[in-house]
Each structure stands twice: as structure tokens, then as C-alpha cells.
């Protein structure tokens, strides 16, 4: 009987394996990152790379995205704009002037005409083989590998959702936007019905106050995560961050510029590695569980030494 039971169990497992096309049930990197994001008790820090790996490749380009995936980055932040024929493409600016060999608003180009332009590299050199990618092209590269923060994209929610569904990566998408508590509640409902994660952006003023954060702490459903910006570090930041995390939300910091993180930024940590704990360590002490960075490789190395990143 025991042998029959073991054989039956083996057949069940084998059938499950075959029904999945012979693929392992091991969670994908994107699924692992999403699970960490959704778990308030998770200690691992999520690393989000700002405009992908723009230090080594054109920002918002396919090679830049592929580079941060190889690094082990958890979230890639990309920016979207729409062409004149209604196609979402990756562009931080409303014009193509800074990042390509062309000029004019993105919205004045059809996709075909935009694809004739060539992206500029880190030092302004023209990249003969690289054009602005579409959002669909970018999400296809990201599928199963990395979460995607679609910045400048909230006004295009239906279009982003349609593309994400086509690529089958809806649960990898993160939206963020500023606005009132009521606007956030409506956005959370809209995103929650699809599986997309919505993250409100809140700011602590130089005087240490934030009416927006206060409105969240007054009650109601809390978002999974807040993006918190603060130009001046103070004990008020400690108070607010503790209140948000005690309420069950995670918090995201932008270490890309000092004006967004009380001068605890990437460049200070990178240029003075012996003092990295003064900067990154301070942000960790505040309870931040996601860092948007311009130094993804350096930050990952710092976090791994502390056992805070896989």
C-alpha cells in the first residue's frame, strides 16, 4: 500500500510538472520581488533603477533595461510618452531633443518616423543601431524578470494596461502619482481590480509637516507603499516614517538626488564609501524598503554586504 501511495504521489507530481510544459514552479525574479513588496514584514530591500542603466547605455533603452536585469535589480523605472499615432514609447522628456539626434515633441512624430531617429549615448554620441523603444518592446524584455515602475504613465492607464495584458505582465506594473487622499483611494481601487500596484507620492516640507501624510494617517485603507520625498532631514522624518510603517505601509525613497532624500543620496555614498552608512544607513534606519537609485550596482553591493539583498 505504501508503494502504491508513493507511486500515486509521484504520478501527481509528474502530471503537474508536465502540465506546466516541463517548467519548474520556482517563482520568477519578478514574482519574488512582488512578494517582497507586498509583505510588510519582509526585511529585504528592493532596488529600483532610475531610467534603467543610463550611466552605461542610453536612458530608457533596451540595453539599459537588460543591463539592470543582469545586475539583479528588482524594479526598473521607465518613462512613457505617446506618439501622434497613439503608440506609447519610452521617453522621459516631452521632446526628443536631449536623447536623440532629432528635435521636436514626441507627440509630433508617428512611430515610424520616431524609429528613424537614433538614441544618444551617455556622452552624447549617436548610437547607430538604437532607436526609442515602444512600451510593448520594453515590457517584453522585462516579462518575468523585473518589476516595472511606469513613470509619467498614469494619464495613459488604459493603454498601459492593454499592453501589459498583451505581454502578460500586468502583475509586474507599478504606477505612482501625487494627489489627494481621495484621488489615491480611487487609483488604488482602479489598479487593485487589475493586479497593478499603485503608490502615492507624498512630500514632507522643509518645516517638517505634511498635510498629505496626515490625511492618510487619519484613517482609511493604506497603500502598499508610499514614495516619500523630503529635502531636509530632521526628527520629523523619523516620526512620519514610523507612523507610515506602523500603519502597515512600506516606504520608497529616491536616493537619486539630495533634494529628494535629505542629502542622503547616491553620489555622497558613492564618492565617500567609508561614509556610506551615514547616507544609505540613515535611510535604512528610517525604515525605507525600496530605493530608487542612480547607482544600482553600487547600492546592491552595499545592501548585500548587510544581508539585505539577494
What is the predicted role of each segment?
Residues 1-31:
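Bacterial Sec-dependent N-terminal signal peptides
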Residues 20-310:
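Phosphate-group recognition and catalysis centered on beta-loop-alpha active-site segments
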Amino acid at each position: 500500500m505504501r508503494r502504491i501511495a508513493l507511486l500515486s504521489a509521484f504520478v501527481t507530481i509528474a502530471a503537474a510538472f508536465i502540465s506546466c510544459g516541463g517548467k519548474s514552479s520556482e517563482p520568477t525574479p519578478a514574482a519574488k520581488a512582488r512578494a517582497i513588496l507586498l509583505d510588510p514584514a519582509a526585511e529585504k530591500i528592493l532596488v529600483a533603477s532610475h531610467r534603467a542603466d543610463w550611466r552605461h547605455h542610453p536612458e530608457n533603452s533596451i540595453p539599459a533595461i537588460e543591463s539592470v536585469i543582469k545586475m539583479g535589480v528588482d524594479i526598473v523605472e521607465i518613462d512613457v510618452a505617446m506618439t501622434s499615432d497613439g503608440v506609447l514609447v519610452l521617453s522621459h522628456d516631452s521632446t526628443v531633443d536631449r536623447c536623440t539626434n532629432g528635435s521636436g515633441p514626441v507627440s509630433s512624430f508617428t512611430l515610424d518616423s520616431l524609429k528613424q531617429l537614433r538614441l544618444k549615448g551617455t556622452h552624447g554620441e549617436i548610437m547607430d543601431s538604437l532607436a526609442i523603444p515602444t512600451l510593448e518592446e520594453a515590457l517584453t524584455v522585462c516579462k518575468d524578470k523585473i518589476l516595472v515602475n511606469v513613470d509619467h504613465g498614469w494619464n495613459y492607464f488604459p493603454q498601459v494596461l492593454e499592453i501589459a495584458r498583451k505581454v502578460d505582465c500586468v502583475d509586474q506594473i507599478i504606477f505612482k502619482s501625487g494627489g489627494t487622499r481621495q484621488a489615491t483611494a480611487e487609483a488604488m481601487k482602479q489598479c487593485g481590480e487589475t493586479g497593478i500596484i499603485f503608490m502615492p507620492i507624498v512630500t514632507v516640507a522643509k518645516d517638517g509637516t505634511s498635510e498629505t501624510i496626515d490625511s492618510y494617517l487619519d484613517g482609511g485603507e493604506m497603500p502598499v507603499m508610499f514614495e516619500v520625498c523630503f529635502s531636509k532631514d530632521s526628527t520629523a522624518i523619523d516620526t512620519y516614517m514610523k507612523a507610515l510603517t506602523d500603519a502597515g505601509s512600506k516606504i520608497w525613497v529616491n536616493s537619486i538626488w539630495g533634494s529628494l532624500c535629505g542629502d542622503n543620496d547616491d553620489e555622497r555614498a558613492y564618492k565617500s564609501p567609508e561614509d556610506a552608512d551615514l547616507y544609505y544607513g540613515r535611510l535604512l534606519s528610517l525604515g525605507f524598503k525600496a530605493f530608487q537609485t542612480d547607482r544600482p550596482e553600487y547600492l546592491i553591493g552595499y545592501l548585500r554586504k548587510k544581508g539585505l539583498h539577494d
